[in-house]
Amino acid sequence: MLTSPLSPFEHEDSNLLLSAEQLTQYGAFWTAKEISQQPKMWRKVSEQHSDNRTIAAWLTPILAKPQLRIILTGAGTSAYIGDVLAAHIQQHLPLATQQVEAISTTDIVSHPELYLRGNIPTLLISYGRSGNSPESMAAVELAEQLVDDCYHLAITCNGQGKLANYCADKSHCYLYKLPDETHDVSFAMTSSFTCMYLATLLIFAPNSQALMQCIEMAEHILTERLADIRLQSEQPSKRVVFLGGGPLKAIAQEAALKYLELTAGQVVSAFESPLGFRHGPKSLVDSHTQVLVMMSSDPYTRQYDNDLIQELKRDNQALSVLTLSEELLTGSSGLNEVWLGLPFILWCQILAIYKAIQLKVSPDNPCPTGQVNRVVQGVNVYPFVK
């Protein structure tokens, strides 16, 4: 149980109800700091974007191309940003003939001709915490090789990375560097994920009111809900399932990865949509399985969420069936799901770090033997010959 090590501390250096000394002892200092700093970082990213006078000018002629194809790309957590946002950005493009797709760098690198179209003008938006993952530069270089009219927008937390250096001084490239604090030191991406995610929304579909609601919800979680999340983490689960529909499916995927990473695989995690869960994945639910359903803010979609929740409760097989909703955090409803994803993933990040500490796994370095690394290693990138 976490009750003893997670007792509250009124201390300026505390995060997530843990003192700095405890966080260091548990190998959780950086992860806790980076999770907790997110509302502050969202404000900082927004302020930085408001001061940016060049991104709109660079994008305007590109967004005037009727057949423009935008690819949102990254690897792992960075790839999930595109999965969350692609359909939403599609709705905000100026021309109906333009297209947005989320394609991971890992797919582009292994199957370049399957995903890249030489005769279609393409804006490749690359996400990278460090910008040093082998696939990041390989995807950029393949796009340069195969696409006749290609542009690059690098959204990164590291101004010194390979991706940043490539895009810094080329007219068909734009480097959108986030504040240094978003370059997470810990193993798992937390604030880097949400800040690259937010930057994309600010560029293509800004909504200042929605952002303020997200910040308020995140602050509510960090000041009022930590004890609730801690209790959820104390349940003796061996499996955890995150469910979300539409954009929230990719948030569920990122939540599952965070749980898997921070617990070093000691708790098996899975994700699906509420409707998709019945089509086979529901088989993994047993008395050791926690299920967390991320509720849609759309009344139509929510009917499907509620149906599955009631079904899981009637089945009485799961260890617990938890719900995460806008009402839980604010008492109101109606915020678009792409914005809800920000406070929802914060909740799940906290759940994962608490579970890791309970299992005596260091969240800052959950895999000290090196099978999995903060920046991916061991990837051979081969030349592509047309």
UniProtKB/Swiss-Prot annotation:
Family the UniProt entry places it in: Belongs to the SIS family. AgaS subfamily.
EC number per UniProt: 3.5.99.-, 3.5.99.6
Keywords in alphabetical order: Carbohydrate metabolism, Cytoplasm, Hydrolase, Repeat
Name the UniProt record assigns to this protein: D-galactosamine-6-phosphate deaminase AgaS
GO cellular component: cytoplasm; plasma membrane
PANTHER family in UniProt: D-GALACTOSAMINE-6-PHOSPHATE DEAMINASE AGAS-RELATED (PTHR32502:SF3), N-ACETYLGALACTOSAMINE PERMEASE II COMPONENT-RELATED (PTHR32502)
Misc. remarks from the entry: In Shewanella sp., the active phosphotransferase system (PTS) specific for the transport of GalNAc and GalN is replaced by a set of GalNAc- and GalN-specific permeases and kinases (AgaP and AgaK, respectively).
Catalyzed reaction equations: D-galactosamine 6-phosphate + H2O = D-tagatopyranose 1-phosphate + NH4(+); alpha-D-glucosamine 6-phosphate + H2O = beta-D-fructose 6-phosphate + NH4(+)
Span of domain SIS: 59-217, 222-366
Source organism of the structure: Shewanella sp. (strain ANA-3)
Subcellular location: Cytoplasm
Species lineage: Bacteria, Pseudomonadati, Pseudomonadota, Gammaproteobacteria, Alteromonadales
GO molecular function, one term: carbohydrate derivative binding
BP term (GO), one: N-acetylglucosamine metabolic process
Pfam families per record: SIS (PF01380)
PROSITE patterns cross-referenced by the UniProt entry: SIS
Function of the protein: Involved in the pathway of N-acetyl-D-galactosamine degradation. Catalyzes the conversion of D-galactosamine 6-phosphate (GalN-6-P) to D-tagatofuranose 6-phosphate (Tag-6-P). It can also catalyze the conversion of D-glucosamine 6-phosphate.
SUPFAM superfamilies, sorted: SIS domain
